[in-house]
């Protein structure tokens, strides 16, 4: 378990405002995480290649099948606001 002072320091670095209850709870949780990391550090990983994902994942693509799309009028019919045949949205500054 890490101390409340350490939890408060990490929270300050992350710009998090924690209550006393949250500090106490986070101390236990962070301590458990650090214990898990220490167990991993103790493993003999000689010969184990580094990997970002332990599973051999590949993308599954569907066939590209052209089909009829929505007509402009149908798409604009459900828009809250339109202008000159286009969607009108609030400006983002």
UniProtKB/Swiss-Prot annotation:
Pfam families: GatC. GO terms for molecular function: asparaginyl-tRNA synthase (glutamine-hydrolyzing) activity; ATP binding; glutaminyl-tRNA synthase (glutamine-hydrolyzing) activity. Its EC number is 6.3.5.-. Keywords: ATP-binding, Ligase, Nucleotide-binding, Protein biosynthesis. Signal peptide: none annotated. InterPro entries: Asp/Glu-ADT_sf_sub_c (IPR036113), GatC (IPR003837). It catalyses: L-glutamyl-tRNA(Gln) + L-glutamine + ATP + H2O = L-glutaminyl-tRNA(Gln) + L-glutamate + ADP + phosphate + H(+); L-aspartyl-tRNA(Asn) + L-glutamine + ATP + H2O = L-asparaginyl-tRNA(Asn) + L-glutamate + ADP + phosphate + 2 H(+). One of its GO terms (biological process) is translation. The keyword Transmembrane helix does not apply. Heterotrimer of A, B and C subunits. Allows the formation of correctly charged Asn-tRNA(Asn) or Gln-tRNA(Gln) through the transamidation of misacylated Asp-tRNA(Asn) or Glu-tRNA(Gln) in organisms which lack either or both of asparaginyl-tRNA or glutaminyl-tRNA synthetases. The reaction takes place in the presence of glutamine and ATP through an activated phospho-Asp-tRNA(Asn) or phospho-Glu-tRNA(Gln). PANTHER family: GLUTAMYL-TRNA(GLN) AMIDOTRANSFERASE SUBUNIT C, MITOCHONDRIAL. Belongs to the GatC family. This is Aspartyl/glutamyl-tRNA(Asn/Gln) amidotransferase subunit C.
